[in-house]
Swiss-Prot record:
Keywords: ATP-binding, DNA damage, DNA repair, DNA-binding, Exonuclease, Helicase, Hydrolase, Isomerase, Nuclease, Nucleotide-binding. This is ATP-dependent helicase/nuclease subunit A. It comes from Symbiobacterium thermophilum (strain DSM 24528 / JCM 14929 / IAM 14863 / T). One of its GO terms (molecular function) is ATP binding. Its cofactor is Mg(2+). GO terms for cellular component: cytosol; DNA helicase complex. The keyword Coiled coil does not apply. Signal peptide: none annotated.
Length: 1371
C-alpha cells in the first residue's frame, strides 16, 4: 500500500495509518500531526488495491464543525493532488464525486441525520426543528416556572415545601430551581439516566445496623483521611530533618520520630481497617511536651522552624479527629436516613420536569441538542440492552453494514452517551473485523464542565495492547502512541517533559507521565541566527507580594531580590531597590492588582522581545512559509489565561499604555457595554413606557440627547406621576392626556396606512430643539419651546416604534431603529467605535435568532435577555478583529486548544483554582450520585454528610486532574518561546513550602504535595526548585526548606531543559514602571518617522532609498479589486459588447418603481456586518415570484413594464405541464391554474400571450421538445468560473493571472438527445428577430459553454425563440 504524500512518516505514524483488523486507539501527543495521520489513513483506505472502500463507507466524527470542514477539505485536497498525478484514475474520480455525501461531521450532526431519517420510529413530526441553545434555555425556565407554580398550588405544607425550605436558598426557591436543572443536565450525558437517578436515591436507603465501610462513599473518604495524615507525617519528617542539622534542636529527635511513627501507623490503617479501627488509631496519635533546650546551644531559627512544622502536623491531625471522628458511626448513618425522603421528593421533581420539558418541545415540534444524542441512542439501542450489555437495533445493524470504518477525532472529550452511540454503530467482530479508529490525547481532555469523560479513553488505553503489526487474538484492541512533537522547539519540549514527569501521575492526573506520555522533539528547527548558545530557556517570572525580609520559619537569611539573567526591561538585574521609602512608583505599584503587575511585566518583556534591548537584539522566529527566520511580530504572541473574566480588559489596557496593540474576545461584559444598555433600555420602553429608569436612560442617551437639567424640567412638569406622565405633560401641557393615549395605545390600521415619514435621528431632534435659538445648535436644553419640540418628536417615534414592534419581526424593528436614529453611526465615532458597532450588530443578530423561536414578542425577548443575564450567560463583546491583524492575542487556555503560537505567555499562574463546583448544598458525581448537606430549615444551619464529603473529595481530585491537563494544554501551545508569569503573596513562604518535596527520590513529587496544590505555581514551583536552574528558589526557601547549595536530586541533575527564573519583589518590579535611563540618540528616530514629523538630521542614503521604495510601492493587483468577482450572464454581455443597447425586456423600470422605502433598507446578512455608511437594498430572493414592486403598487397599474412582462412569460414557460394539451385553450387553462396557485397575479396572466406560446409548441422546434418531454430540463441555474483575463480584457496579464470571475445564469430549456443537447432561450423582444439575435450571441455562447463544461456533453444546437414575432433563430 503506497503512501499518498511525500511526508516521511515516523514508524508510529505509519502504524496508525496502516493498522487494520482491530479497534485502534491512538494516543496522539500535542503537535504529533494526528490530523495529517487521519487524512493519510483515509486516503490510503480509499485507494487500497487489495481492499478499497468508498469515502461514503466511512463515518468520520470530529469535535467541532470547523474540524469537520477542515477534515473534508484536507481529504478533498489530497484526492485532487493524487488525481493530478493520475488524471485517468476512475477510482479517484469516484471518491472525489462521493466526498460531498460522505459522513464527515460532528457527532451531533450525525445524530441529526439519523433523527431526520428515522423520525417515524421516534414518533416525531417529520418537520421537527432543532432549538437553538438560547431558545431551549428560555423554554426550560418557563416549564420550570409552571412546574413550581403547580407544585406550590397543589401543596400547602407537604414534601415539596419541605424540599424548598431546605434547598431553595433561603429567600426564594432559586437554589432549588438551579439544582433541578443541574441534575437534569448531568443526566443528559449519561447513557442510562433514569437508572442513575434511581440508584443515586437508593444509596440513601441505609438499613439499620449498616457499617460505614460498606457504604459506597467510604473508599474516597478513606483516601482523603490518608492524604491528610500523610501531610502531617511529612511535616514531622521535615521537622526531624531540620532538627538533625548542625545547630538544630537534636533533643527533639526522639519525640518527633515517635510522633511521626504514630501518624504513619494511623495512615496505614486507612487501607485495611474499619471505621472504628481507624478512629482508634487516630485517637492514639498524641503530641507530648518537647524537651527543653538551653539558650545558646541551638540555632534559634532552626528551633523556631521545627516548632512551626510540628504545629502544622498537630493541626492536621486535630482536623482529622474533629472532622471525621467527632461523631459516632450511628450518627453519620442517621443523617443519611433522615435526608433520604427529601431526596426522593427532589428526584420526583426532576422526573416531572424532564417529562414536562419533553412535552413542551413536542408541542412546538422541536427538539434540543441534548435530544439529538438521546434520540439517536434510542434508535440504535435494542430494547433488550442493559447497562452492562449493549444490543444493537436493526437500525444500528444497517449502519454497521454501511460503515466499514468509524474514525473518531478528539476521543478524549466524548461522554458516555456519545461513546454508546459509537459502540452501537461500530462492528464488534460478528459483522466483520472491529472497525473503530479513535484518536485523542487524554492529557488534553479539558472539557469536564461539558461532561466529557476522560475515563473512557483511559479505560481503553489500559485494556488495549500495543500494536504488534497485526491484531492479537483475544485482545480488546490495539494501542498506538504518537509521541513525536513537530510543533515546538527542543527547549519547550524538554521543559514540558521536565515539569510533567514530576507532577502528572495516575493519582494526581489520572495518567502516569511515563515514556509513552512524553513528548519527543521532532520539529527540526534550524539553529538560531547569530547565536551559538543552546535553546532559549523557558522563562519563569515570579512576582512577590511582599518586600524582602525573613520568612516565617525560614531563618533570617536574606535572599537576593532578583535572579536569572537580564530583567524584563532589558536594563540590568531586577531587584535593585533605590532605598527610598516614599517612592511614587512604589506607591503606584501598591495600588495595582496582581494581574495589573503581571500585565506590566508582560508588556516590558514583549517590548524587549520585539524591539530588542541594548544587550539583546529583537527575537527571531522561524517563518514556515518563508523558510527562514524573521523578526518577531505582535501577531506571533499569545497571552493565555485560565480565567479571563475581568482580566483581559486589564491586560489590554496595560499593553495599550505601552504602545502594544492587543486583542482579546471577552466572554463577559457585553450586557454592561453602554451602547447595549442604552438600546436595551429603549426596547424596555417600547414594551412598557411606564418604566422610569429605562425611559430616563433613553432620553439622556445620544438617541435623544437630553441633559440632566432637561430631565429635571420634565419631572417638574408632573412631580407625582410616572416619568412617562411627566414626559407627556412637558411635551404638550395643553393636551397631555391625548398624547399619553396616543403613545400608549396601539395604532389603528388607518393610522398605519398614513404612517408619518421616517423620524429624525437624535441629531435631528437636537436641531429641532435649537430652532428657537440658533446659538443653541447642537444642544437640546436651552428653551422650553425647543425642549418641547424634541419631546413631541420622541413621542411620535415611540408611538410608531411600539406599533412596529407589535406587527413586525423584532429584528426588523431593531434594524429600523438603528437606521432611523443613526445610533449605529454615532457609536462608531466613539472610542472603540468598531467594537461598539459590533456589539450592536450582535444584539441585532440575537434578535434575528429570537425571530426563529416558536414563540416571539418583545416582552418574551426581554425576558430572554434577563434570563441570559441571570444565568451569567453573557455573550461577551462581539468579535471585531480579523485573523491577519498584527496584535497580541489574549485568550483563555480553553480557546487556545488546537492553536499554536511562536511565543506564548501563560499568566495568572498564582491564582487559586476555582472551587465553584465544590460549593453548594448538594453536589453531583457520575459514580457516587448525590452528595447532600443536612440543612435545618429552622436555624438555617447546615453540615455535611458522609456522602457530601465523599463526593466533594472525588470532585476535588477530578478538578485537580483537569487543571493538570489544562496546564499541559497551555504549555504545549508554544512553538519557540514560553514565558510563565505568576504572583504570590509571600514568595519566601511559598518556596519554603515547595522545597518540602525537593528531597523526594526519583522524578515524581510526593502525592500529598501534588494533591494539596491550590494553584499552578504549587506544581511548577516545587518542580523547578529541583532543577539546576532553580537555585534562586532554593536560596529563597532558606532554612525552611532545602539547605542552600545542596542542589537538586541527582536523578534530575542531568535534565536538558533550561530555565530562567526571575524573582520580582515590589522594589525590583518598580524598575519596569520607570522610564529607561537616557541613552545616546538612536541612529534613526523611528518615533518621528512613525508620526510623520520632520527629522533633526538627514537619513542615511541607503535607508532613505529603502524607505522611498517602500512608500512608493503600489499594490500590483489594484486593477482587479475594482472589478466585480461575480457577474450574471446579462451583465457579462456589457463587457463583450459595450455598445449594445439593452433589449427591451431587460430594461430596468424607472427608479421610482424600484427604489425601496427608506425604512426597508436591508439589514445585514447573517454572520456579516452591514455597511455602516449606506445599507444596500436586499438582494435576497423574495418569497414571491415577482419581487420587483410590492403587489399593491402592481394592482394600481394598467400595464406591466417590459421586464415584468418578460419575467411573467418565463414563469409560465417554467411551470407549463408539457404532458397536457398546449393549444391556445390549453395554455389558457394552465394560466388560470397558475393564478389560483398564486404563481401569477391576474394582471400578470393577462400580459401573457397564450396564442404565441401555443404557436411555439406547434412549431417544428416545439414539437421536437414535446416528443422528448421526459428528457427536457427547464430553468436550469448554473455557476461557471471564467478566467478574469477573458472577461476583463483590459487588465494587465500579471494582474489577472490565476483569477476567475464567477458567472451565473439561468437556461430556459435544455433538451437532451442522443448526440448532444439542444438549448432554447425565450425572448419577448418586439424587435426584428434577426437583429435582436445578434445582441444575444454572448449570452448563448456562455450558456453553451456552461452546459458543455458542467455536463460534459456538447450542445449541438442553440435557438432563440422570439414569442412576439413567433420565430426561432438558430445561434
Amino acid at each position: 500500500m503506497r503512501a499518498m504524500s511525500d511526508v516521511r512518516w515516523t514508524p508510529e505514524q505509519e502504524q496508525a495509518i496502516t493498522a487494520r483488523g482491530a479497534d485502534v486507539l491512538v494516543a496522539a501527543a500535542a503537535g504529533s500531526g494526528k490530523t495529517a495521520v487521519l487524512v493519510e489513513r483515509i486516503i490510503r483506505r480509499l485507494v487500497d488495491e487489495r481492499d478499497p472502500l468508498d469515502v461514503d463507507q466511512l463515518l468520520v466524527v470530529t469535535f467541532t464543525e470547523a474540524a469537520a470542514t477542515e477534515m473534508r477539505d484536507r481529504i478533498g485536497a489530497a484526492l485532487q493532488a493524487a488525481l493530478a498525478g493520475n488524471p485517468e484514475n476512475e477510482r479517484l474520480q469516484r471518491q472525489l464525486a462521493l466526498l460531498g455525501r460522505a459522513s464527515i461531521s460532528t457527532l451531533h450532526s450525525f445524530c441529526l441525520s439519523l433523527v431526520r431519517q428515522y423520525f417515524y420510529r421516534l414518533g416525531l413530526d417529520p418537520a421537527v426543528s432543532v432549538m437553538g441553545e438560547h431558545e431551549a434555555l428560555l423554554l426550560r425556565h418557563e416549564v420550570l416556572d409552571q412546574l413550581f407554580a403547580r407544585r406550590f398550588d397543589e401543596e400547602e405544607d407537604g414534601p415539596f415545601h419541605a424540599l424548598v425550605d431546605r434547598y431553595g436558598g433561603g429567600r426564594d426557591d432559586e437554589g432549588l430551581r438551579n439544582l433541578v436543572l443541574a441534575i437534569y443536565d448531568h443526566m443528559q450525558a449519561l447513557p442510562w439516566p433514569d437508572q442513575w437517578l434511581e440508584e443515586s436515591l437508593a444509596r440513601f436507603d441505609v438499613p439499620e445496623g449498616a457499617a460505614i465501610e460498606d457504604l459506597p462513599w467510604w473508599p474516597p473518604l478513606r483516601r482523603q483521611i490518608r492524604l491528610e495524615l500523610e501531610l502531617a507525617a511529612e511535616a514531622l519528617a521535615s521537622a526531624r530533618a531540620l532538627a538533625a542539622r548542625p545547630g538544630g534542636p537534636a533533643a527533639y529527635l526522639d519525640v518527633l520520630a515517635a510522633e511521626e511513627a504514630a501518624v504513619r501507623a494511623a495512615a496505614a490503617r486507612t487501607e485495611t481497617g474499619s471505621y472504628a479501627d481507624l478512629a482508634e488509631a487516630v485517637a492514639a496519635v498524641a503530641f507530648g511536651r518537647l524537651p527543653g533546650t538551653k539558650k545558646g546551644e541551638v540555632d534559634e531559627g532552626l528551633k523556631e522552624a521545627v516548632g512551626k512544622l510540628r504545629e502544622r502536623a498537630k493541626k492536621a491531625v486535630r482536623a482529622v479527629q474533629e472532622q471525621w471522628f467527632c461523631r459516632t458511626a450511628d450518627e453519620w448513618l442517621a443523617d443519611l436516613q433522615a435526608i433520604a425522603p427529601h431526596l426522593r421528593t427532589l428526584g420526583g421533581v426532576v422526573r416531572e420536569f424532564a417529562e414536562a420539558f419533553r412535552e413542551a418541545k413536542a408541542a412546538q415540534s422541536a427538539i434540543d441538542f441534548n435530544d439529538l444524542e438521546r434520540l439517536a441512542l434510542q434508535l440504535l439501542r435494542d430494547s433488550t440492552s442493559t447497562p452492562d450489555r449493549l444490543v444493537p437495533s436493526d437500525v444500528a445493524r444497517d449502519l454497521r453494514a454501511r460503515y466499514r470504518e468509524i474514525l473518531v477525532d478528539e476521543y478524549q472529550d466524548i461522554n458516555g452517551v456519545q461513546d454508546a452511540i459509537l459502540t452501537l454503530v461500530a462492528r464488534d467482530g460478528q459483522e466483520g473485523p472491529p472497525n473503530r479508529f479513535m484518536v485523542g490525547d487524554v492529557k488534553q481532555s479539558i472539557y469536564r464542565f461539558r461532561h466529557a469523560d476522560p475515563g473512557l479513553f483511559l479505560a481503553k488505553y489500559g485494556a488495549y495492547r500495543p500494536w504488534a503489526g497485526a491484531p492479537e487474538p483475544g485482545a480488546a484492541g490495539a494501542r498506538i502512541v504518537l509521541g513525536a512533537n513537530f510543533r515546538s522547539r527542543e527547549g519547550v519540549v524538554n521543559a514540558v517533559n521536565f515539569l510533567f514527569r514530576q507532577i502528572m501521575s495516575a493519582r494526581a492526573g489520572e495518567l502516569d507521565y511515563d515514556r509513552d506520555a512524553e513528548l519527543v522533539y521532532r520539529a527540526g528547527y534550524p539553529p538560531l541566527p547569530g547565536e551559538e548558545a543552546a535553546e532559549p530557556p523557558v522563562e519563569l517570572h515570579l512576582l512577590d507580594g511582599e518586600e524582602q525580609g525573613p520568612a516565617d520559619g525560614a531563618g533570617s537569611g536574606q535572599a537576593p531580590a532578583a535572579s536569572g539573567p537580564e530583567a524584563a526591561s532589558g536594563d540590568g538585574v531586577a531587584g535593585e531597590a533605590d532605598g527610598e521609602e516614599e517612592d511614587p512608583a512604589l506607591a503606584e505599584l501598591a495600588d495595582l492588582t496582581a494581574m495589573e503587575r503581571e500585565a506590566r511585566l508582560i508588556a516590558a518583556r514583549i517590548r524587549a522581545m520585539v524591539d530588542g534591548t541594548a544587550d539583546q537584539p529583537p527575537v527571531q522566529v522561524w517563518d514556515r512559509k518563508l523558510k527562514t527566520y524573521r523578526p518577531l511580530q505582535y501577531r506571533d504572541i499569545a497571552i493565555l489565561l485560565r480565567a479571563t473574566t475581568g482580566r483581559i480588559n486589564t491586560i489590554i489596557e496595560v499593553l495599550s499604555q505601552s504602545g502594544i496593540p492587543a486583542y482579546g474576545q471577552v466572554s463577559t461584559g457585553y450586557f454592561q457595554a453602554t451602547e447595549v444598555q442604552v438600546f436595551l433600555s429603549l426596547l424596555q420602553v417600547l414594551d412598557n413606557p411606564l418604566q422610569d429608569i429605562p425611559l430616563a436612560a433613553v432620553l439622556h442617551s445620544p438617541i435623544v440627547g437630553l441633559s440632566a437639567a432637561d430631565l429635571a424640567r420634565i419631572r417638574l412638569a408632573n412631580p407625582r406621576g410616572s416619568f412617562y406622565d411627566a414626559l407627556v405633560a412637558a411635551a404638550a401641557p395643553a393636551s397631555g392626556a391625548a398624547m399619553a393615549e396616543a403613545a400608549a395605545a396601539p395604532a389603528s390600521e388607518a393610522a398605519m396606512a398614513e404612517a408619518a415619514p421616517a423620524p429624525a435621528s437624535g441629531a435631528a431632534m437636537a436641531e429641532a430643539a435649537a430652532a428657537a435659538d440658533p446659538a443653541e445648535a447642537g444642544a437640546t436644553t436651552s428653551t422650553a419651546p425647543g425642549l418641547e419640540g424634541v419631546l413631541v418628536r420622541f413621542l411620535e417615534c415611540l408611538d410608531r416604534w411600539r406599533t412596529l414592534a407589535r406587527r413586525r419581526p423584532l429584528s426588523q424593528v431593531v434594524w429600523q431603529i438603528l437606521q432611523e436614529t443613526g445610533y449605529l453611526h454615532y457609536v462608531g465615532g466613539m472610542p472603540g467605535g468598531a467594537q461598539r458597532q459590533a456589539n450592536l450588530l450582535a444584539l441585532y443578530e440575537r434578535a434575528r435568532e429570537f425571530d426563529q423561536f416558536a414563540r416571539q414578542g418583545l416582552f418574551r425577548f426581554l425576558r430572554f435577555i434577563e434570563r441570559l443575564q441571570a444565568e451569567q450567560s453573557d455573550m461577551g463583546t462581539a468579535p471585531a478583529l480579523g485573523e491577519g491583524e498584527d496584535v497580541v492575542r489574549i485568550m483563555s487556555i480553553h480557546k487556545s486548544k488546537g492553536l499554536e503560537f511562536p511565543v506564548v505567555f501563560v499568566a495568572g499562574l498564582g491564582s487559586s483554582f476555582s472551587d465553584r463546583d465544590l460549593r453548594g448544598d448538594l453536589l453531583l458525581n457520575r459514580d457516587l450520585g448525590f452528595g447532600p448537606q443536612v440543612v435545618d430549615p429552622g436555624t438555617r444551619l447546615k453540615y455535611p454528610t458522609l456522602a457530601y464529603h465523599a463526593v466533594r473529595e472525588v470532585t476535588r481530585l477530578a478538578n485537580l486532574a483537569e487543571e493538570l491537563r489544562v496546564l499541559y494544554v497551555a504549555l504545549t501551545r508554544a512553538r519557540e518561546r514560553l514565558v510563565l508569569v505568576g504572583s504570590v503573596k509571600s514568595l519566601r513562604a511559598a518556596c519554603a513550602r515547595w522545597s518540602r518535596g525537593a528531597g523526594a527520590p526519583g522524578w515524581p513529587l510526593p502525592e500529598s504535595l501534588l494533591l494539596s496544590a491550590r494553584s499552578y505555581l504549587d506544581w511548577i514551583g516545587p518542580a523547578v526548585l529541583r532543577h539546576a536552574d532553580g537555585a534562586p528558589l532554593r536560596e529563597l526557601a532558606g532554612e525552611g526548606g532545602t539547605a542552600p547549595g545542596s542542589g537538586p536530586d541527582p536523578a534530575l541533575a542531568g535534565d536538558p531543559s533550561r530555565w530562567e527564573v526571575t524573582i520580582w519583589d515590589p522594589a525590583s518590579l518598580q524598575q519596569i514602571l520607570q522610564p529607561r535611563p537616557e541613552a545616546a540618540p538612536p541612529a534613526v528616530d523611528w518615533a518621528r518617522i512613525g508620526a510623520a514629523e520632520p527629522l533633526d538630521r538627514p537619513l542615511d542614503e541607503a535607508l532613505h532609498a529603502r524607505l522611498r521604495a517602500r512608500f512608493g510601492w503600489r499594490y500590483p493587483f489594484e486593477p482587479v479589486v475594482r472589478r466585480f468577482g461575480k457577474l450574471s450572464v446579462t451583465e457579462l454581455k456589457g463587457y463583450f459588447d459595450p455598445d449594445a443597447e439593452a433589449p427591451a425586456e431587460e430594461m430596468a423600470p424607472p427608479a421610482e418603481e424600484m427604489a425601496p422605502p427608506a425604512e426597508e433598507m436591508a439589514p445585514p446578512a447573517e454572520g456579516s456586518a452591514p455597511p455602516v455608511e449606506e445599507p444596500a437594498p436586499s438582494t435576497e430572493p423574495s418569497s414571491s415570484t415577482f419581487a420587483a414592486r410590492p403587489r399593491f403598487l402592481q394592482q394600481d397599474r394598467r400595464a406591466l413594464s417590459p421586464t415584468e412582462r418578460g419575467t411573467a412569460v418565463h414563469v409560465v414557460m417554467q411551470h407549463l405541464d408539457l404532458s397536457r394539451p398546449l393549444d391556445a385553450e390549453g395554455v389558457g387553462r394552465q394560466l388560470a391554474e397558475m393564478v389560483e396557485r398564486e404563481l401569477l397575479t391576474p394582471q400578470q396572466a393577462a400580459a401573457v400571450d397564450a396564442e404565441a406560446i401555443a404557436d411555439f409548441f406547434a412549431s417544428p422546434l416545439g414539437l421536437r421538445i414535446l416528443q422528448s418531454r421526459d428528457r427536457v430540463s427547464q430553468e436550469l441555474s448554473f455557476t461557471l468560473a471564467v478566467p478574469a483575463a477573458e472577461v476583463y480584457g483590459d487588465l494587465p496579464p500579471e494582474a489577472a493571472a490565476g483569477d476567475v470571475v464567477i458567472v451565473q445564469g439561468m437556461i430556459d430549456l435544455l433538451l437532451e438527445e442522443e448526440d448532444g443537447y439542444v438549448l432554447v432561450d425565450y425572448k419577448t423582444d418586439r424587435r426584428d428577430p434577426v437583429q435582436a439575435a445578434q445582441r444575444y450571441t454572448t449570452q448563448i455562447r456562455f450558456y453553451r459553454r456552461a452546459v458543455e463544461e458542467i455536463l460534459g456533453r456538447p450542445v449541438k444546437e442553440a435557438y432563440l425563440h422570439f414569442l412576439a414575432s413567433r420565430r426561432s433563430i438558430a445561434v
